[in-house]
Structures are given as structure tokens and as C-alpha cells.
Amino acid sequence: MENNIRLGKISAVDYAAGTVRVVYHEKDDAVTAPIPLISSEYFMPEVDDMVMVLHLSNGTEAGVVLGRPWSEKNKPPEGSKGLYRKELARSPGEAMIRYKDGTMTIKAAKLVIDGTVTVSGDVTAGGVSLDNHTHTDSMGGGTSGPS
């Protein structure tokens, strides 16, 4: 049962099958058979990413990738108590969901919502409040806010 949990590096990725091969440099560069990741989400690691693997036997044939530990290459993008942050792209902050202290932030280059959107509070876009904005009338004067 020695060395059933190991750190290794991804040597190959099969995106369609959702499996990877892991190389163990400290084990004479032994490479696993294709093994799956434990995840219900799809975000595959890349070649050379460090991963933690649970082996179900003494060999390298049966195992599962438990995840990517924080490392010099994979640092937390930020950290504080009560923070939830899910990165959705390889570069931190490029595409993510963040929640802290009652505020949720969704960030992406483009956001597509396929369905009806209902908002119960004010909507602000480009610094303009939908509830409290005014327009200039045809005579150059201001109008009252929306009613």
C-alpha cells in the first residue's frame, strides 16, 4: 500500500475520453495507462501540469486523478475567508465566477444568456442606472427618471 497517492505530471491528455497519462519522474519516468479525473465538470489539465493521483493497485494501471494541487505553476489567484472563486479559463481572471459577502461576479469576454432574464433590482450598464437615468429632451432640458 506504499505510494498509493502520488504527485506526478501530465504527459498526455485525451480530451474526448476525459483521461490523462501521468509520468512519475521519481519512479524512473514510469507513465500510467490512461486514467480518468474525478470531476463532474469538464476542465482538463494540460501537459506538464502537476496532479495528485490515487492508485487503486500497486502498479500504474488503475488510478484516478484527484486534482491539481496549488504549486508554483498553479497559484491561487486570490485568497480570503468566505471567498468562492471558480476559474473557467487557464489564465486567472480571464473567465470566472466569484462570490464573496453577498456579491457574485461573472466575468468573461462575452456572456450569452439563452433564456428569459428577470431582474428584481436596478440594472446598471456602462455606469448608467436603468431605474434612475434621465434623458435630454428636444429643447436641451432634462427629463424626469423612468416611471
Where are these regions (language model features)?
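Exposed beta-strand/loop interface patches that mediate assembly or binding
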Residues: 1-94, 98-99, 143-147
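Short, flexible coil/turn micro-motifs enriched in small/turn-prone residues
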Residues: 3, 43, 58, 110, ...
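Low-complexity, small-hydrophobic/phenylalanine-enriched stretches
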Residues: 97-98, 103-129, 133-135
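Protruding loop/beta-arch "assembly-hinge" segments enriched in small, turn-prone residues
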Residues: 131-147
